[in-house]
């Protein structure tokens, strides 16, 4: 099993559209940072202030860099539909049923995937093809 690099120093960091750290992140920027800490270069997709554009960018890139899986492992990307019509959010699975993420009005947090608010919004689990075998 892979081990997600320590991320406790990221908890509480603020949200910023297009944020790639070190002081602020958007949801995909946080994923990029976690992969960087694990020694992996996650491809960065053009960030935009339009949440629909962010989701579309990831989904287009996912075809080349990620494979959809059914059971999450550490460092898998979980996509969520938080807006009514499209996928617009992601988090990184950190094990034990938990994921780390950030949203526009929520600083970096680690939450339980099984809570109703997140469980019914999940739209897919994606594994980066560049991850070493588990």
Identify the function of each model-found stretch:
Residues 9, 34, 93:
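Conserved catalytic core of Hanks-type protein kinase domains
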Residues 4, 43-108, 113-114, 134:
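...with weaker cross-activation on analogous glycine-rich loops/strands in unrelated enzymes
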Residues 11, 21, 41, 109:
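Glycine-rich, flexible loop/turn motifs
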Residues 20, 104, 130:
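Residues that form or immediately flank small-molecule/cofactor binding pockets and catalytic motifs
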């Amino acid at each position: 099993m892979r081990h997600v690099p320590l991320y406790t120093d990221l908890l509480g960091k603020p949200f910023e559209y297009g944020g790639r750290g070190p002081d602020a992140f958007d949801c995909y920027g946080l994923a990029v940072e976690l992969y960087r800490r694990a020694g992996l270069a996650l491809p960065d997709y053009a960030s935009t202030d339009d949440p629909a554009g962010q989701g579309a960018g990831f989904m287009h890139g996912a075809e080349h860099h990620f494979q959809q899986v059914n059971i999450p492992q550490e460092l898998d990307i979980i996509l969520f539909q938080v807006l009514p019509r499209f996928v617009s959010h992601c988090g990184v699975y950190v094990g034990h049923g938990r994921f780390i993420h950030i949203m526009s009005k929520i600083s970096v947090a680690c939450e339980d995937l099984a809570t109703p608010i997140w469980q019914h919004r999940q739209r897919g689990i994606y594994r980066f093809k560049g991850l070493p075998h588990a």
